[in-house]
């Protein structure tokens, strides 16, 4: 009724009253150039908007509640692409130009396929071709270095870490998986296999409860999972000391959901670290600017 009363029942009317479109230069999805893009990005007339919203909502933020949560320290870990990744990015750019120019049927190639390949390539070159070598400077190896360093440093406290990755989930068919690669490398360095677990292994509520309990006790010290499976409802914060975002999800709210697993009431650590890994000159840069 309030929207109708103020002639705001149609989105165009609401958007012109409270929103503003902004045109800015941003990276192209394939990561090789820039373009001007107009987005619905700013709000104004905020007092009127909030007054209208508060007619149907009672707002309490975490800051207003003053919940005792740890202080988070964010670290952006940027790595250089391999020569093979650079070549593959160039190939993605060529594909994108053909798609934009209408030179290829959408059933053969399209921007969705290209962006999906771009996400995989930014994660690890073996995602597109598992016959390619393990690049020493990859963000997967940078992540393994940090996980192991923190695992070793916090051994006396049995602190735990979460590793988020939405792509390349565990597989048993012999194909390359980032999950399997990270666990294998940690075990090779001396981390007990029982301390590195996948959320996907807990395929029932009973198994999930047991896994969460072991993580809270410090028996499982590295837990890997996707935002969908290890986001909302995952309460393992008791000993969490670090969180690793190996890839970037599509929605900013998913990053908040991930961080909410460690920046959480009940965490015994006053300070925690959140690492976000980016492969330069790839689709990672496009995703994080969104």
Regions found by a protein language model. Give the residues of each.
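Active-site flanking residues adjacent to catalytic metal/cofactor-binding acidic residues
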Residues: 1, 165, 246
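Alpha-helix N-cap recognition
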Residues: 7-10, 167, 251
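Conserved RecA-like P-loop NTPase helicase motor core
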Residues: 187, 191-286
């Amino acid at each position: 009724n309030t929207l109708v009363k103020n002639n705001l029942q149609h989105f165009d009317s609401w958007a012109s009253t409270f929103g503003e479109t902004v045109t800015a230069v941003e990276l192209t999805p394939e990561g090789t150039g820039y373009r001007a893009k107009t987005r619905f990005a700013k709000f104004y007339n905020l007092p009127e908007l909030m007054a209208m919203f508060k007619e149907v909502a009672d707002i309490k933020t975490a800051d207003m509640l003053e919940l005792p949560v740890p202080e988070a320290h964010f670290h952006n870990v940027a790595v250089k692409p391999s020569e093979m990744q650079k070549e593959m990015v160039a190939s993605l750019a060529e594909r994108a130009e053909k798609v934009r120019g209408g030179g290829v049927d959408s059933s053969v190639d399209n921007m969705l396929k290209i962006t999906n390949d771009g996400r995989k390539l930014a994660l690890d070159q073996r995602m597109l071709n598992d016959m390619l070598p393990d690049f020493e400077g990859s963000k997967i190896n940078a992540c393994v270095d940090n996980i192991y360093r923190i695992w070793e440093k916090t051994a006396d406290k049995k602190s735990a870490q979460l590793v988020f990755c939405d792509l390349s989930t565990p597989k048993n068919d012999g194909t390359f998986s980032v999950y399997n690669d990270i666990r294998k490398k940690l075990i090779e360095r001396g981390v007990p296999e029982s301390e590195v677990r996948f959320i996907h292994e807990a395929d029932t509520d009973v198994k999930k409860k047991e896994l969460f309990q072991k993580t809270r006790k410090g028996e499982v010290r590295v837990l890997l999972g996707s935002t969908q499976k290890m986001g909302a409802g995952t309460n393992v914060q008791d000993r969490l000391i670090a969180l690793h975002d190996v890839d970037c999800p599509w929605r900013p709210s998913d990053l908040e959901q991930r961080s909410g697993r460690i920046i959480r009431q009940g965490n015994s650590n006053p300070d925690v670290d959140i690492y976000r890994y980016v492969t330069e000159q790839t689709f990672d840069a496009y995703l994080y600017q969104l």
